Structure formats: C-alpha cells, structure tokens
C-alpha cells in the first residue's frame, strides 16, 4: 500500500458515519440503506486491512502518512459546523438537531479529507500508476457532482440549493487542481507521473 494514506480513509469513515445516522431514523429505500452501510463497512475494512492485516500492513509507510488529521481536520470542521448550524437555526427559527449538525460536519470534513493523501503523494513525488488513477477518480467524482448540481438546478423547478454543499464541493475540487494538472500532463505526454516538492514550487 505504498503511497496510500490510511488517514484519508479514516476521515472518510468519520464522514460516512456522521452523514448516515439517518439510517436509524428514516427509511428511504432498500437501495439507499444498503449503499450507506456498504460505504461504512467497505471504508472500515480498508482501514483495518492497511493497519492490521499482513502482508498489506508491512507495505504501509507510516513515516510519510503523518498529517494530523484529527487536530487539523476533524476539530476545525466540528467547530465550523457548530457555528454554521447555530446561525442556520437562528435565521430560520428551527430547533437544534444533532443529526443536521453532524450532516453539516460531514460535508465540511469531506471537502478536506483528501489532504493527507495529497501530502503523502507529494512526499513520494513519483506516483505509482495505480495510486495515481485511484486518486484521480476520487477527485473526478466530486467534479462530476458540480455538473450534477448545475444540471439539477436548471431542470428541476423545486431543486433546493445548499450553499454549504456548493462551497465544500468547489473547495474539494480545487484541492485536486494541482494533482489533476500533473496527472493529465503525464498521461498526455506519456511520461512518468510525479509531483513537485514544496522546494520546487518556490
């Protein structure tokens, strides 16, 4: 698992658990429920495999995956979500909802969950083909979400706009911008995919 950040997956697990708490309160459809459970279970399985299961465990480079994801990811997003939720219920005169608060938190956290992975790749500089493709498609799905919002806003008369979702979606896509540039540059030129170091960028 060289080049893969388990900390990014740990952040995504927190995202899915806090976002899908409505599994216990609201039933939408069997498909919806199964997919939510699948997201949580598959992400937890990936984390367990990388951290504890041999021989995968020995290929995980802890020394490169050192971003303080709880201090600089979870904590700031929790504070921001609380402030946003309080402002929202005050302006709309709604009651406090822990499920809504955690949903907002999950949106903020998802937007920066890729940071540990991008930092690991920059430290390695040369990115393996499989790892590069994996991260590219993780970012591409979020970029496609933006196109989906534009489409639905145009064609659905009663589409509900959510500016926190918009902001976080754009932010997440922008975090990938540098990676996308070098990934596509390597693919079009047929060269080896590598990312510049911070020293090179100056």
Spans of features found by a protein language model:
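Alpha-helical membrane-protein topology signature
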Residues: 1-202
């Amino acid at each position: 698992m060289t080049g893969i950040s388990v900390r990014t997956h740990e952040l995504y697990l927190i995202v899915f658990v806090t976002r899908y708490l409505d599994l216990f309160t609201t039933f939408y459809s069997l498909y919806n429920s199964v997919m939510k459970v699948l997201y949580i279970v598959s992400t937890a399985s990936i984390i367990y495999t990388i951290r504890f299961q041999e021989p995968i465990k020995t290929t995980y480079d802890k020394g490169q995956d050192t971003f303080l994801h709880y201090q600089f990811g979870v904590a700031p997003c929790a504070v921001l979500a609380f402030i946003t939720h309080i402002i929202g219920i005050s302006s709309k005169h709604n009651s406090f909802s822990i499920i809504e608060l955690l949903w907002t938190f999950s949106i903020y956290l998802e937007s920066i969950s890729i940071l540990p992975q991008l930092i690991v790749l920059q430290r390695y500089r040369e990115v393996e083909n499989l790892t590069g493709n994996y991260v590219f498609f993780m970012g591409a799905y979020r970029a496609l979400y933006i196109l989906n919002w534009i489409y639905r806003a145009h064609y659905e008369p009663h589409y509900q706009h959510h500016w926190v979702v918009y902001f976080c979606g754009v932010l997440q896509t922008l975090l990938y911008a540098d990676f996308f540039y070098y990934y596509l540059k390597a693919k079009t030129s047929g060269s080896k995919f590598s990312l510049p170091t911070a020293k090179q960028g100056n």
